Amino acid sequence: MSIKAEYIWIDGTQPTAKLRSKTKILSDGSRLPRWGFDGSSTNQAEGHASDLVLEPVFSCPDPIRGGDHLLVLCEVLHTDLTPHPSNTRALLRPVAERFAGQEPIFGIEQEYTFLKGDRPLGFPEGGGYPAPQADYYCGVGADAIFGREIVEKHLDLCLAAGLGLSGINAEVMPGQWEFQVGALPPLEVSDHMWVARWLLHRVAEEFGVTASLDAKPAKGDWNGAGAHTNFSTRAMREGYDPIITACEALGQDDKPLEHVRQYGTGIEDRLTGAHETAPWDAYSYGASDRGASVRIPWQVEVEKKGYIEDRRPNANVDPYVVTRLMVDTCCTELARREQI
């Protein structure tokens, strides 16, 4: 029986990478071979040396095609099998391995916005604006919710693929939604997030809309779209002092700027200090504070153990990058203080 394997990879588009995919027919799904592609057509190579390599790193059932068909997430390599500069997964791998003993795990909240043409779904066609933000967040009813049928289909597809989704909800702006992935280790949560994003774009195709990860899809008094990143280590899940250490590590010296510069395109447009954000150029942390850079959830403060939420990453952040930065910054300081 022939198997359709959809090879998925992250391209070299700047400033925000896009997903690409193509189908390989296999006689046996137990072995996923390397494959190649034209990097000159994906912003990853020039025409005179355009061959690049797809290295399978994660696979799951293809919930769209069904049967034994597969989705295959790949790293991009040069023909000498060294990582391509666009391959951010290769940079995460050694960091994840170095700090694996601290058992870091992540839950990432992926916000996104459905667009019909260049306007959010739910905005009046032909111009104008809907009612101000108030009733849309976790709302119900045709006057508040736009695109639920797409969201539900995406959720079903992700679960059928075995991805680690943990929930969905409507967000603050019309046509804006969120799904959550995790809690999982850094490589796994990032792999699952990229495949879930691919499925989101793929199912949106069928409904004639675009699933945008733009950080500020509607200018003015409308919420932006983020990827709030929840993080803990074993020590943080067992005590409060390591939680404070992690929060302080993220604010040390030039760490705030180092992080936000890599937290997605359009960070200054979204992190303004309004709409449940902290200013992009100021660092803060606090319990239950959605206006802080990093939030300590209320139950964590009460129980004196748990996790933290970095609220700065944009919806278009690369999960391989944000997990690498947080593991490196927090786990290095936790190790220095022997809070492991």
Swiss-Prot record:
Organism: Streptomyces hygroscopicus
NCBIfam families, alphabetized: gln_syn_GlnII
Enzyme class: ligase
Gene3D superfamilies: Glutamine synthetase, N-terminal domain, Glutamine synthetase/guanido kinase, catalytic domain
Catalytic reaction annotation: L-glutamate + NH4(+) + ATP = L-glutamine + ADP + phosphate + H(+)
Gene Ontology CC entries for this record: cytoplasm
Family: Belongs to the glutamine synthetase family.
Plastid as UniProt keyword: no
InterPro entries: Gln_syn_GlnII, Gln_synt_N, Gln_synt_N_sf, Gln_synth/guanido_kin_cat_dom, Gln_synth_cat_dom, Gln_synth_gly_rich_site, Gln_synth_N_conserv_site, Glutamine_Synthetase
Gene expressing this chain: glnB
One example of a Gene Ontology biological process annotation: glutamine biosynthetic process
Function: Catalyzes the ATP-dependent biosynthesis of glutamine from glutamate and ammonia.
The protein, known as: Glutamine synthetase
Principal subcellular localisation of the protein: cytoplasm
Pfam families in UniProt: Gln-synt_C, Gln-synt_N
Source superkingdom: Bacteria
Binding site for L-glutamate: 276
Transmembrane segments: none
Subunit structure, as described in the record: Homooctamer and homotetramer.
Positions of the GS beta-grasp domain: 3-82
Subcellular location: Cytoplasm
GO molecular function, one term: glutamine synthetase activity
Note: Two forms of glutamine synthetase (GSI and GSII) can be found in this bacteria, GSI is a typical prokaryotic glutamine synthetase whereas GSII is similar to the eukaryotic enzyme.
Cofactor(s) demanded: Mg(2+)
Keywords, ordered alphabetically: ATP-binding, Cytoplasm, Ligase, Magnesium, Metal-binding, Nucleotide-binding
